[in-house]
């Protein structure tokens, strides 16, 4: 069994430490923040300023791999997650009745919850785990590195105090200092592939009133205009978030910080209006997030690993813009794989690097492609032109066969080519279009003139 040092106590760090500990490894988790999540979710969510983790207060939808990994590795955490208020939503719940079951349909489940609920459940489990020692308020300041070809990381430093480890896991997040430490230690530099995402997010949180309306009706959770996306994230404990997405260069972005302006703009989208009409209680200010990139940080190159005794996971490895909701899912998948292969990874990380390239890199590439297209479309207010692609998206909400394909892609279970390019899906979309010869791709949100008038008040 390996001695493992995990740097960073976010979702990926907690999940990695817990899964390693339950496999019998001796784990020390270092987290520079002295505070940890507890049982008061609203206090921790609405009143904990966490500038290093801007995504902590942004809305989340936890995709199928989150549920699958938790049920397989830590079923008690999954039970606790539901007990704390997370809710399961099956993609076929959109329909009055689920279609006849096919293999894999049981995986098409989104967990509707705030990130803090998962963090609280993982934190509680880590506290109970005797093989995991958490050192809060202890900032890792460097690595201990032994010479070799390649060099070997032998532990971490906390101030002047060394801590030996057979394997160090960098889960310090998108601002991880580890790549710079490796270069300073004389290692070949990590290979970084970074793409700026020209997309900005603004959200506001609400809570349904106990004595008020609770059902928005049968309405999609997403709407769009040529220059903006809008959506609602139903969440735990009667909370929901309204979310707007624009180009970072949109001149109206700053005005949306005003709650009155934000809500007026959000009401121009059917998805948001249906929920705002429930007269829910606002629970937060308007929360912006921008300045993001998609970044892949490989600790290996064409000559092999740049170092042994160290791997990265979570946002330290793959940081993706949140439009597709991949972050938590990919972080827990990596934690599961690492826990199952810790001893061999400590000896030689080549297998882990190969797995991340094969299993996770395609998701990164898909996010980059999606964000490039979205950023250009939002910046240019481009109209929809691909009739069949628009029909595929619309048809999913009428046809369970197409919804299944859509859900398989969304939940990272199949690639778009695998899910959509089948004879069955093609036949169903063709029939849907034939029944709607007048169908034209369109947006359900405001025009630019309407939007500008709303922002101007």
Protein language model features and the residues they cover:
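Short beta-strand to alpha-helix junction loop
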Residues: 61-62, 105-124, 177
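General small-molecule cofactor/ligand-binding pocket signal
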Residues: 28, 133-135, 311
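N-terminal Rossmann-like FAD-binding beta1-loop-alpha1 element of flavoenzymes
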Residues: 2-39
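C-terminal helical "tail/cap" subdomain of flavin- and related membrane-associated enzymes
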Residues: 339-457
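Predominantly flavin-linked oxidoreductase catalytic cores and closely associated redox partners
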Residues: 128-265
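Helix-loop-beta segment of a Rossmann-like dinucleotide-binding subdomain
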Residues: 97-115, 245-249
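N-terminal FAD cofactor-binding segment of flavoenzymes
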Residues: 19, 40-95
């Amino acid at each position: 069994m390996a001695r493992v040092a995990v740097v960073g106590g976010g979702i990926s760090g907690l999940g990695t430490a817990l899964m390693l500990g339950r496999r019998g490894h001796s784990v020390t988790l270092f987290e520079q923040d002295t505070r940890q999540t507890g049982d008061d979710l609203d206090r921790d969510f609405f009143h904990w300023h966490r500038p290093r983790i801007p995504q902590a207060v942004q809305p989340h939808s936890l995709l199928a791999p989150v549920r699958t990994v938790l049920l397989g590795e830590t079923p008690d955490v999954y039970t606790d997650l539901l007990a704390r208020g997370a809710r399961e939503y099956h993609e076929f719940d959109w329909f009055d009745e689920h279609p006849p079951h096919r293999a894999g349909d049981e995986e098409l489940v989104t967990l509707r919850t705030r990130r803090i609920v998962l963090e609280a459940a993982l934190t509680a489990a880590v506290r109970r785990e005797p093989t995991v020692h958490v050192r809060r308020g202890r900032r890792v300041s460097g690595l201990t590195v032994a010479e070799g070809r390649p060099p070997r990381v032998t532990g971490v430093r906390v101030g002047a105090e060394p801590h030996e480890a057979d394997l160090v896991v960098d889960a310090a997040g998108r601002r991880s200092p580890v790549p710079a430490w490796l270069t300073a230690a004389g290692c070949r530099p990590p290979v970084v592939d970074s793409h700026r995402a020209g997309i900005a997010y603004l959200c506001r949180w609400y809570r349904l009133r106990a004595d008020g309306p609770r059902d928005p009706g049968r309405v999609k959770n997403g709407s769009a205009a040529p220059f903006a996306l809008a959506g609602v994230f139903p969440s735990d404990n009667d909370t929901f978030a309204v979310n707007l997405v624009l180009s970072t260069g949109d001149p109206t972005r700053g005005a949306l910080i005003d709650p009155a302006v934000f809500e007026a703009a959000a009401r121009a989208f059917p998805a948001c209006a249906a929920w705002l009409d429930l007269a829910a209680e606002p629970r937060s200010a308007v929360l912006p997030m921008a300045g993001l990139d998609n970044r892949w940080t490989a600790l290996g190159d064409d000559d092999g690993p740049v170092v042994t005794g160290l791997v990265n996971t979570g946002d330290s490895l793959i940081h993706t813009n949140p439009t597709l909701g991949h972050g938590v899912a990919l972080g827990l998948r990596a934690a599961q794989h690492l826990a199952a292969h810790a001893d061999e990874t400590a000896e030689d990380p080549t297998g882990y690097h190969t797995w991340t390239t094969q299993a996770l890199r395609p998701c990164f590439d898909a996010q980059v492609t999606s964000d490039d297209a979205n950023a250009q479309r939002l910046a240019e207010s481009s109209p929809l032109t691909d009739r069949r692609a628009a029909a595929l998206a619309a048809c999913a909400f009428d046809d369970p066969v197409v919804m299944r394909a859509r859900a398989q892609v969304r939940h990272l279970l199949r690639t778009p080519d695998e899910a959509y390019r089948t004879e069955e899906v093609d036949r169903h979309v063709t029939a849907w279009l034939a029944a709607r010869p007048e169908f034209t791709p369109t947006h359900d949100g405001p025009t630019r003139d309407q939007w500008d008038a709303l922002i101007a008040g």
